[in-house]
């Protein structure tokens, strides 16, 4: 293969990686719409608990650590810190990710919805 052919291949590979990466980048506006499912139990804009804990500044927070909310023993003992990766896994299947969690929601089925909700949580805080 010629040098030009290899350079073109590398350029196409790089372009493909950029496109794939941006496909999973979340959209905060769409995430706000998806978050409507969560609003029944969680606030994102005020430090007040509902059925679930508030999600103000949730990224970087140790799971089960918010004062004033009664977490499950499983959540308190999980040792998780909420970052994009742990939050994504939890939002997809809460009861599988933290067995014994009190969260009744079954999870978000679409990876794009998960990414959008995380983008919304980041933008809201």
Which residue ranges define each predicted feature?
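Juxtamembrane/interfacial segments around transmembrane helices
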Residues: 1, 84-86
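Bacterial N-terminal signal peptides that target proteins for export
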Residues: 1-11
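Bacterial N-terminal signal peptides
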Residues: 9-19
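Sec/Tat signal peptide C-region and signal peptidase I cleavage site
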Residues: 19-27
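Periplasmic/extracellular electron-transfer cofactor-ligation site
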Residues: 26-81, 88-101, 123-125
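A general structural signal for short secondary-structure boundary/capping elements
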Residues: 85, 100-106, 119
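Short, exposed beta-strand-loop hairpins at the edges of beta-sheets
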Residues: 106-125
């Amino acid at each position: 293969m010629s040098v030009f052919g290899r350079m073109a291949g590398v350029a196409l590979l790089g372009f493909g990686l950029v496109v794939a990466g941006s496909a999973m980048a979340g959209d905060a506006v769409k995430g706000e719409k998806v978050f409507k499912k969560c609003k029944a139990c969680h606030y994102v804009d005020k430090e007040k608990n509902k059925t679930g804990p508030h999600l103000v500044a949730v990224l970087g927070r140790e799971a089960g650590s918010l004062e004033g909310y009664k977490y499950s023993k499983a959540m308190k003992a999980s040792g998780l810190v909420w970052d994009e990766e742990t939050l994504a896994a939890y939002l997809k299947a809460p009861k599988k990710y933290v067995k014994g969690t009190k969260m009744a929601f079954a999870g978000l089925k679409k990876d794009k919805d998960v990414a959008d909700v995380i983008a919304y949580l980041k933008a809201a805080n």
